[in-house]
Amino acid sequence: MSKKTGTKTSKSGSKKSNKDVEKLVDDEDIQDLSDKKNKISQSKNLVKNNKSSKNSKSSKSVKSTKTSTKTSLKKQVKTPPKKQTKTSSKKNKKDESDDDVTDNSDISDDDNTGNSDISDDENDQEEDNDISSDEEETETRQKSSGKKGNVNKDVGSSRKLKTDKNARNDNKVLEIRTTQTGALKQVFERVSGVISDCCLTFMPADKDINNAGDDNEYYEDESTKSSHKQSKTTDRPKNTGGIRIIRLTEDNNTLVKVVLEAANFEYFRCDEPKITVGVDMHTLHSHLKMINDDDPIVIYMKKDIQGSLYIRSLSENNDNSEEREIELFLMDIINPEIPVPKTEFQNRITMKSDKFHLICKHLSQNSTFVEITSINNEILFKGQSEGGKVTMTYKDTGYKKKEKPDQVIQGVYELRNLLGFSKCNKLCNTIEIYLKNDFPLVLVISVATLGKMYVFLSPIDNGN
């Protein structure tokens, strides 16, 4: 019994001890767990503190970098941002991560976010620098473009001035353009019929040149003399410029004067007050034959080659276009000035140019000289040869009768010279004849719309 009770007590005691042990074990586990919880909470607090410190550091670094970039922009110094902050921040982050044992994953994530924030801020700084540099470049470009624009304006104006100067400095001292080529050809042909060589004088308008008042001279009869006295004194003739020819024939029986006004040409330019050139009229006429009457021509002289006169023509047809350039070698000719005084004639007759040509042509076949008699509006042409006499009469229908009694004007002239200048039907429709006793006969022929040609024919005594 004692044995049984002892075993029972031992068993009960062992049971009690086991329970106590279990209780002790449970208490130890609870303490361990609480300790672990405390450690975990401490580690979390450390992590939070680290995060806050890192965020404050990053914000401070961002603010400092922004202020530094602003000051650098103000100073306009283009310096790239330094990368030392990155390396230092990375080192600090590595040290802090090494010190913290727990929650390494969270800390590394926070480090990555911090690095990304800093890198973003630095990228923003670089973008700001790039933007500022771009703005500076655009400003400089605008300034340079503005300068270039002003320079281009100056260049454009200078080019215009140069073109205007080139119009005057084109190596030409004389330039004349006209479309009335046929009229010029007729004038030179008529002059070459009686004169072998002569001087051509080119003058600009409104210049004081000797005998300038003779350019606009006119001839009138005695009946209209009194009505024009006041106009002569008040309206002084001016030099209209243009082309002048005045020349005596070799026998001194005929004087030819041509006045072509500058304003009647399409373009007339003469850089000198007076240019006089000697020309062989036969050569000039033969060269002009190669040019059509309808082709426009340009007459010019070069500054460096004043021994030649150039004539250029351009003919444009539907089929083709042809251009001709003639260089006429000039001659040294003495050109004596021959004054032509204004004269009041006794009578003036206006005839149709073709009628005048037919009369001279028919009379020249049977006679060498012609006797011209004028009474009022009638003019008589008489020719005599060994076979007989021929008289042809023409009446001026537009003649105005004079108040004075009838006057008879009579003179004998050489038919050859009259016939040469009677071929003027291509120049004008009518011809004017001025007559006066014991004075040269004057023919006034209009040269289309360019000017006039005056022919003075001296009378022959007793028909010899």
Swiss-Prot record:
Residues 41-71 have a biased composition (Low complexity). Disulfide bonds: none annotated. This is Probable DNA polymerase sliding clamp. GO terms for molecular function: DNA binding; DNA polymerase processivity factor activity. It comes from the Viruses. Gene3D superfamilies: 3.70.10.10. Residues 72-92 have a biased composition (Basic residues). Residues 1-168, 210-239 are annotated as: Disordered. One of its GO terms (biological process) is leading strand elongation. Signal peptide: none annotated. The keyword Metal-binding does not apply. Belongs to the PCNA family. Sliding clamp subunit. Responsible for tethering the catalytic subunit of DNA polymerase to DNA during high-speed replication. Keywords: DNA replication, DNA-binding. Residues 97-138 have a biased composition (Acidic residues).
